[in-house]
Amino acid sequence: VSIQQTQTLGPTVRLFHLPLKIRFKAGTAITDGIAHVSQTGEDFYFALPGKPEIVRVDPDYTWLAQVEFPLPAEMLHAQLADPADMIGRVLAVEQLATKQDKTTVGKLRHALNTDPFWGVRLEAAKALRQIHNDDARTALLAATNQ
């Protein structure tokens, strides 16, 4: 995992020194690792039992920070389907809004129609609007029948 601190450094703004939790999920197995962040840019390595399906940075929202952590669509789809992580689902939808493939539109449509949290459904509707293709339009129109 590569971590960059992007704040503009100066006399009153310095590098953060913090323990940052990174969570890896593969099936039902959850592995938490701690990255001790202290430099402008650092790479961290974690021993895992297999390829993770989901990777979450600061999953407990310990730090007040703007985290940009782009993930491949496959991981975002898995994160969107994780019933235990409501905020993770919202974050996945926000990233999926930049993808226009049929699989992603289908996953967003499913979230729009079935997610138990209204905030995820709202973000899914916004994402489909941003995707702005025929499949997304069809998904939005179908959702008006809820």
What is each model feature region?
Residues 1-130:
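Non-catalytic accessory/interaction domains
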Residues 133-146:
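Extended amphipathic alpha-helical coiled-coil/heptad-repeat regions
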